């Protein structure tokens, strides 16, 4: 699986398998700040999810009992549930925009959907997110592919 970014926080993932009905596009919106050595508070408009390779782990939220796909790469200090070092992050969960409540998941998040719309707050928001999360989980179940690469177009 790949998420290809064209702009700082928007990406898209193309999945293709007969078990999910052929080719499906998942649109993503990542948290728009990226801390680095020059800007410790983050750069607004640059994703907090670093480009690179990640593993996906399907985990149950202890708060709402729903299952979410989480990105994990401990070499990038993105751990699943526990932080080893103070600057570690917990995994990034794929969640739906429509019913998203940051208090119902642990860790960080990537909003996803099978389409998108312009939000009056000034960004394109993924919509039909529950469908997107279901497609991601079905794709992983059908293929066994639990790896994801995030890169720039």
Identify the meaning behind each predicted range.
Residues 1-127, 131-146, 153:
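Cell wall/extracellular polymer interaction/catalysis modules
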């Amino acid at each position: 699986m790949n998420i290809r970014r064209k702009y700082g926080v928007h990406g898209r993932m193309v999945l293709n398998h007969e078990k999910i009905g052929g080719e499906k596009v998942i649109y993503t919106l990542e948290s728009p700040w990226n801390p680095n050595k020059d800007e410790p508070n983050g750069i607004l408009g640059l994703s907090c999810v670093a480009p690179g390779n990640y593993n996906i782990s399907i985990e149950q939220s202890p708060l709402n009992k729903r299952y979410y796909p989480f990105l994990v790469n401990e070499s990038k200090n993105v751990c699943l549930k526990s932080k080893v070092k103070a600057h570690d992050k917990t995994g990034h969960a794929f969640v739906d925009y429509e019913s998203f409540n940051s208090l119902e998941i642990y860790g960080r998040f990537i909003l996803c959907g099978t389409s998108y719309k312009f939000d009056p707050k000034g960004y394109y928001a993924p919509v039909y997110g529950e469908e997107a999360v279901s497609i991601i989980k079905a794709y992983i179940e059908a293929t066994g592919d639990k790896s994801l690469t995030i890169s720039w177009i």
